[in-house]
Amino acid sequence: ELLAKEKVDVIFGCWTSVSRKSALPVLEELNGLLFYPVQYEGEESSKNVFYTGAAPNQQAIPAVDYLIKEMGATRWVLAGTDYVYPRTTNKILAAYLKSKGVKDEDIMINYTPFGHSDWQGIVSDIKKFGSAGKKTAVVSTINGDANIPFYKELGNQGISAEDIPVVAFSVGEEELSGFDAAPLVGHLAAWNYFQSVESDENDEFIEGWQRYIGDDERVTNDPMEATYIGFKMWAKAVEKAGTTDVDEVEQAMIGIAVPNLTGSIAVMNANHHLSKPVLIGEIQEDGQFEVVWETPDTVIGDAWSDFLPSSKNLMSDWTAPLRCGNFDVTTGKCSG
């Protein structure tokens, strides 16, 4: 309807990967343009989508590296909601961990439905799994409102962040807003932006958002920054192309650079993914995050994982002459 009836030039949106994948065939058929602002599982590349959220190598992989190097984790719980993003991300993470020498018996994988609230049995299993004498960490792709009862049950069973740290990919300022964050203090999240980051751009953005919404307690979060970056880039690309035509703007987007909110520069690459910093934040009592680690430079998002046999030889480059989203470097063939 937005494309065929309203004739919109661009869409900024979709939340879950399910919604994005549902919209994708329509976008490609009607030649629409989508800026997708949420972290996702990778393994996808479309001419009609710019992925301004994190790919796995801009969130999941660095988070695991942090837990290995800084916290000495050797045993892993991959806990997620049962849909495409957690399942694909955990498939990548399991392969990555095995490439690091982690054995199958040191990886526990668990999936729960959306909105899951009874965590007693699962947390008990995690506690037992973590009692084998090896440093255990939880990598969480649990989505939405299921997170709060999960963390509460960790506390109920006496599991602290020092005992078994949890790093989450779907818990941010908005999810913690209005909740008692005490059970979550010390646990971690991996994003490309936190509201607590100190920069002039961030101060201006927060002030403008709170003024617009009429609430000086309203929080900001990573998908908001990704949307902000995408919109500024699209505006620059339209100015560069001199038109809102999708094909012209899509090509003009490549190489566009704008300031992000963390004090560095976001660049749109030929694979329709951003260069972004990766930050690890520790949850505080007020629901904000203290940044405890960040990459020294921005990281280019990778559409295809290096750790899955099905995609390790694939690359995405939407510039001429290649103009391909899944080019196999071993066969020299493009599949789309």
What positions do the PLM features span?
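Extracellular/periplasmic periplasmic-binding protein-like sensory domains
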Residues: 153-228, 238-244, 295-331
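Periplasmic-binding protein-like
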Residues: 2-15, 35-37, 75-80, 133-144, ...
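Extracellular/periplasmic Venus flytrap/periplasmic-binding protein
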Residues: 41-42, 48-157, 196-204, 266
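Surface-exposed patches in mature extracellular/periplasmic domains of secreted proteins
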Residues: 13-14, 78-81, 216-225, 245-249, ...
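Solvent-exposed, acidic/polar segments of extracytosolic/periplasmic ligand-binding ectodomains
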Residues: 257-336
